[in-house]
Amino acid sequence: MDGRNERPTTPVSDFRVGSSEQSQAGVNLEDSSDYRTSNSAESKKGNLSGKSISDLGISNNDNKNVRFTADTDALENDLSSRSTETSDNSKGTDGQGEEDRPARHKRKPKVSFTHLRNNGKDGDDETFIKKIINNLTGNQGGLVPGLAPIPSENENGKDDIEKNNRNEEIPLSDLADASKIVDVHEGDNKEKLEALKLESDVNCTSDGETLGSSSKNSFLAPAVDHFDDYAENNSSDDNEGFIETSTYVPPPSQVKSGVLGSLLKLYQNEDQNSSSIFSDSQAVTTDDEGISSTAGNKDVPVAKRSRLQNLKGKAKKGRMPRLKKRLKTEAKITVHIADILQRHRFILRMCRALMMYGAPTHRLEEYMVMTSRVLEIDGQFLYLPGCMIVSFGDATTRTSEVQLVRCTQGLNLWKLHQVHAVYKRVVHDTLGADEGNALLDQILADTNLYPPWMCVLLYAFCSAMVTPYAFGGDWVNLAISFFMGLCVGSLQFILSQKSYMYSNVFEISASIVVSFCGRAFGSIPRSHICFGAVTQGSLALILPGYIILCGALELQSRSLVAGAVRMFYAIIYSLFLGFGITLGSALFGWMYHNATNEISCPQLISPWFRFLFVPAFTISISLLNQAHISQLPVMVFISCTGYVVTYWAGKHFANSTEFTAALAAFVIGVLGNLYSRIWKGLAVSAMLPAIFVQVPSGIASQNSLLSGLQSANTIVNANETITTSTSDPSSSMSFGMTMIQVCVGISVGLFASSLFVYPFGKKKTGLFSL
């Protein structure tokens, strides 16, 4: 053991570098190009060059993990097998060869220790050197973890304590996900930050002073899939978007980072400065210790880290230019955050406007996805009846912001046209998000074209016009339908708007009032008032035809949750109407025993006169839904064409309501989509009045709405109780089933027409069609 202390020792750091050829030829390892120490002569003298192995304070008690090999040949075989295993496991995960790797990623040549076997004359010395060799060649670093060879899987060249101290039994695939996350956060700034690292070492500036001069890669760097408009390098190659490519607009190759990520970038410099000082202070050692306690951080040599302790006292060169650069970066980040907030606000307001003004519900998610893609926002959308769940993702911080857009769904054809115009301008990049927000705010703040009192008159006129062509009423019934429509319109547009409690029972109360008054007018002797025509005509506008149509379209477009909820609600809604009609008729029958029992009109007007009432009904119902006068010609033309198809198809297919509705809806859809494709109009606003014409016609073809009247006649004539009306479930359910048949046929025809005109969909904007 005395000979060990007398002979000159080789610095411990010499064991980790240098090729076997250099070692055997007697080349000094300190002059090797792979020698990983500082270039400063002072650091070489102050750290390891003057220390021997015995002076490191290593005792036999510390050698708990030392592997003893009694045979020298076994040692050589063990070393050769370990070197082969290390070379196999140290290949890059990206499949690059040794020649394709960057200079800083290439593996260091393994040190050949075979020439050291016979250097010592004492057997104890040889055994002790073997212990050191066995531990140095292991993956865990043995006695001195900082001197272990750097594995090539540490591609980033960063401090990775978890990899350095990991157990050999843990497969490398367990760390694949974490490695991917780190690679994504580093982004395209690896070469840039390496250059800045060298520059910061030359200038002797403080680590963490600015983002650009930091010698450590920023964990919050822009991700590969994102870019910041204030970053110097925002280029990316073939990056895939986050949103699935099931719709027409391809996902953007780059999306904006979120607000939280930008805010963290704003305060990243201060956080990095404090954290770097704390972490580096633990790695700094005194000259008496000679070696760092955290030498396992293999990328930073001990000599370089030892001079970090006095950097704060040195003069900082070029501080003012860096401060100006930092202030400029903060200003750009502030502008970036404002732009992101404007885009988020535009998406939310566009969603609210589309829901309030009657956009096709089965295409709402498609519209919002396309809008977010054009605005380069990572957004996910889920539509439920009455609300839209919006999630704005931020992959930089692995967080998301969830917004709930909830509003009462209505129908406003003119405002829908205006919102669609803003949507098209933003999608085609002719209007910014901030200007779009201003326009949407103005549209939302504008009042309706027609006040409530005018809507009441239009409702009454619609009831009068639908009675002759749909339910067979004569000229006398027009006045009665107008009067009862006036009552229903007052309940809907005046009383329901003022009382929230009454709005929940509006449908039942309206059906009770209409059936009661209709039977009262029909019981007047020699009045020629048709009880069934005036009752159905007055209730035609509150039929759940549009609700069932939206549900059928959603189910056909695979929106199962929204479609199922809407369909079930429409069926229950139909049962409410049927119950109200039965109850109102029975009430008047109990009060007046000579009440009329006729549910069909004895006198019918000429079928050719019916065609005159269709355009009048189309105009009135379009104005009732807040359509502009400029939109009326196209609506009237499409509506009249659809009714002509319905009338002649009903002559040939008398017992097939759904087939007749499908043919008419196909013609309506083709005309509406051609209007959108050729004249660049809004197809949904032109098609909706024509669809409203089809629903009452389909209902009247089977007289399903009169099932409640038939039940009321049975109650009055047989002097039975109301419980008799529930004995025949087929009569109470027939109205809802007829509505479903008509709307399913309409939905099939509309989808077929969209496929006929737009076989491949639209390239950039959503298809604003039913």
UniProtKB/Swiss-Prot annotation:
- What subcellular compartments does it reside in? Membrane
The cross-references to InterPro entries, in alphabetical order and at most eight, read: ThrE-like_N, ThrE/Ser_Exporter, ThrE_2
Keywords attached to this entry: Membrane, Transmembrane, Transmembrane helix
Q: Which residues cross the membrane?
A: 453-473, 475-495, 505-525, 529-549, 568-588, 604-624, 629-649, 659-679, 681-701, 740-760
Q: According to the UniProt entry, which residue ranges have a biased composition of type Polar residues?
A: 49-63, 78-93
- Keyword Membrane assigned to the entry: answer is yes
Note the coiled coil stretches, chain numbering.
none
Q: Which domain of life is it from?
A: Eukaryota
Region (Disordered) residue spans: 1-125, 139-169
Q: Which GO terms describe its cellular component?
A: membrane
Its membrane topology is listed as: Multi-pass membrane protein
Q: Which family does it belong to?
A: Belongs to the ThrE exporter (TC 2.A.79) family.
The identity of this protein, by name, is: Pheromone-regulated membrane protein 10
Gene name on record? PRM10
